[in-house]
Design a protein with these regions (language model features):
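Serine-dependent carboxylesterase/thioesterase catalytic core
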Residues: 1-55, 76
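C-terminal catalytic-base region of ester-bond hydrolases, centering on the histidine
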Residues: 34-124
Length: 124
C-alpha cells in the first residue's frame, strides 16, 4: 500500500485547465486521500541564468503565462512554482532547479537534486 505520493514539478493548478484536469480537480481536489502523505516539489530558477538551456530561455515566460495567466512568475522553466505546489501538501521548493534535462543541467531527477529533495521530505 502506498503511503506517500511525490510530485515533481507537476502543474496542479492552471488557468486554462484541460477537461481531464478540471474533472480530476473537481472529483479529487488537492490532497484528497487522507491516508496518503502528499509531497509536492517545485523548482525555482532564474530564466536567464547559466543553469538554464536555450529552450528554457525561449519558452519559459509563455509557458508560465499559459498555466498561471502571468508570465512574470517564478518556476522551473516550464511550470510556475505556484502551480507545482499542491494545496495542503508538504511543499518543497528547490532553488536552481529546472523541469527536466532538456531545460538545464540541474533538474528534479539529477543525482544531486534527488538527494536534496529526498532528504527534505517529512516521511510518514
Amino acid at each position: 500500500t502506498a503511503r506517500n505520493l511525490i510530485t515533481l514539478g507537476s502543474p496542479h493548478q492552471a488557468v486554462k485547465a484541460t477537461r481531464l484536469r478540471k474533472f480530476v480537480d473537481k472529483k479529487y481536489p488537492g490532497n484528497f486521500f487522507k491516508n496518503i502523505n502528499y509531497i509536492s516539489i517545485g523548482g525555482e530558477v532564474e530564466i536567464n541564468s547559466k543553469e538554464t538551456s536555450l529552450l528554457t530561455k525561449l519558452i519559459a515566460r509563455n509557458s508560465y503565462k499559459s498555466i498561471s495567466g502571468n508570465k512574470n512568475v517564478s518556476g522551473d522553466g516550464l511550470v510556475p512554482l505556484s502551480s507545482s505546489l499542491l494545496k495542503n501538501s508538504q511543499q518543497i521548493i528547490l532553488p536552481k532547479t529546472v523541469h527536466g534535462g532538456i531545460f538545464g543541467k540541474n533538474w528534479y531527477g539529477s543525482s544531486s537534486k534527488v538527494r536534496e529533495w529526498w532528504d527534505l521530505i517529512n516521511w510518514k
